[in-house]
Amino acid sequence: MAKLPVEKMRELERRFGEIEARMSAGPAADVYVKLASEYSELQPVVTKIRAYEKAVAELADLETLLEDKSVDREMRDLAELELPEVRARIEALEQEMQILLLPKDAADEKSAILEIRAGTGGSEAALFAGDLFRMYERFASEKGWKVEVLSASEGEAGGYKEIIATITGRGVFAKLKFESGVHRVQRVPETEAGGRIHTSAATVAVLPEAEEIDIEIRPEDIRIDTMRSSGAGGQHVNTTDSAVRITHLPTGIVVTSSEKSQHQNRAKAMQVLRSRLYDAERQRADSERSADRKSQVGSGDRSERIRTYNFPQGRVTDHRINLTLYKLDRMMEGEIEEVVDALMADYQASQLAQLGEQQ
């Protein structure tokens, strides 16, 4: 196990005390909100640090007592009984703190942009993309998060060729960031008379929702085109010049949005563009920082097949951590917490292993 960073623990305690003092002094409302946010982030960590320090002090007292030859037999027996319990408590607290003190991803607390695109498999792939979107939508609903569709291109037989949505809430990106990659489905299409199993796929990308302070987009770096957009009356009825396409010239990234309001379209397209640029910057920094990263979970390679959904067997397999669950129906209803937590645990274990190697 990697050693606990004692200096970092002391610094966190010092900062927590400073925040408590500043909040008690009655600062301005905007300052108070920022302090309260940092306070709630630090509180669980500092609570564990204090519990750990208390347990270490208890252990030291017990060991001192046992070394004292003048202590009577009854007291020594009680101390010897307590010793294993205190050591076990310290070990458990050390493991918990190893996780709490891991380097934080600055984007973890952010909302996210979810992009799902049908891949190989034609109409079946589009239907599967629709199934995946509903799965994430239901998971988000259970978490109390808000889902808003930014743009959608429907498949001919249903589902989506492409759908982009924002999922708004605290910690959305932390929960969903390991969903990026190729999701494969194996099932018998409803139109298949012979009952043959077809394989199709959809690609999922989960991006942290970037704010203006996260990424700067210069006006001269973008080209905005206005296009005709279909209204409610059909393909060529009620068309308006509201659809917007924004091209980021330095990178070639293109984003479109086709809601009724041109103003809304521009804002939504800029929101997606900002998040894609922010994500590209994060990916570049990650690859430079961890070229030798051993964890498959955190690789972020969106061309990698990460999960298979086998409908005839009711089986879902996540290939990165060799996890197989026979609860496909429940997962498609949004019950993906078990997989999400297993992926996070695997990633944290790989981070801990790397920290141990560095020490």
From Swiss-Prot:
InterPro entries: PCRF, Pep_chain_release_fac_I, Pep_chain_release_fac_I_sf, Prokaryotic/Mito_RF, RF-1. GO terms for molecular function: translation release factor activity, codon specific. SUPFAM superfamilies: Release factor. The modification N5-methylglutamine is found at Q235. The keyword rRNA processing does not apply. It comes from the Bacteria. Keywords: Cytoplasm, Methylation, Protein biosynthesis. Transmembrane segments: none annotated. Methylated by PrmC. Methylation increases the termination efficiency of RF1. Residues 280-306 are annotated as: Disordered. GO terms for cellular component: cytoplasm. The keyword Membrane does not apply. It is found in: Cytoplasm. SMART domains: PCRF. Pfam families: PCRF, RF-1. NCBIfam families: prfA, PRK00591.1. Belongs to the prokaryotic/mitochondrial release factor family. Peptide chain release factor 1 directs the termination of translation in response to the peptide chain termination codons UAG and UAA. This is Peptide chain release factor 1. It comes from Rhizobium etli (strain ATCC 51251 / DSM 11541 / JCM 21823 / NBRC 15573 / CFN 42).
